[in-house]
Amino acid sequence: MTRLSFGRKFFLTFDYILLSILAFLCLLPLVNVLAISFSSSTAATANIVKFWPVDFNLKSYTYALSKPEFSDAYWVTIKRVLIGTPINVILTMLVAYPLSKDDRLFRWRKYYSWVFIFTMLFNGGLIPWYMTIKTLGLIDTFWALVLPGAVPVFSVILLLNFFRGIPKEIEEAALIDGCTHWRILWRIFLPLSAPAIATITLFALVGHWNSWFDGLILMNKTEHYPLQSYLQTLVISFDLKIMNVKEAELLSQINNRTLKASQIFLAALPIMLTYPFLQKYFMKGIVMGSVKG
């Protein structure tokens, strides 16, 4: 067993301490939001809630889950993730596979690669983007949230580099055995690229779940808003229509701050539950997809 030098031990100790401090600082806002969401309106208004609930209650969550606007926005986002993520992953694979081939198999590979890279570095601006979507008749439709970003270029580059790292001898042996490129992609490349596939899947999932700007721009009706667009309007709005609630007990335990905190935490919860299971694939896919080529 190799013994670590003093300098190496010092570096690792400093590294762990620094990362622990940064992780703690990142958790503080989330813990504060969670504590506020479980606190009474009186405690939240008095600004005495720090990192532990004061006068614990679940009224904010009960009211948040009963609001049709919140439920509709949640459903739109779930549908967007379930439909948009597979579309992103499938199209990314179909684009990355031919671009990973040699020039003798795909003559215009470098040209198309630069076209994709150019679109990642430069864009036509907000107004041309909006006019294009409007011309396609997608304004105020669900597909406006999915199709404009159906082929994420960064994911294409990541998967492209991963595909190039697969030994060519495997593909050549499969071609000799009579496999088509479709079969090579689905039976050989995809199983070997599981970490990269998991990485781009996580990118797509988080991107769809956290996207808010396109919903505000492309949706005319609030009932078509995805969750993050709804929360964005909620954060800047001071009128949450709480006065529609008749029960005096509920009114005494809910205010704007506790309701916002509960809805923000409910919006972040699915990602927090999903990420730990994909983290190992995420790190491996990022490292291998960035160094191979």
Report each predicted region and the residues it spans.
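A hydrophobic, multi-pass inner-membrane permease signature
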Residues: M1-G293
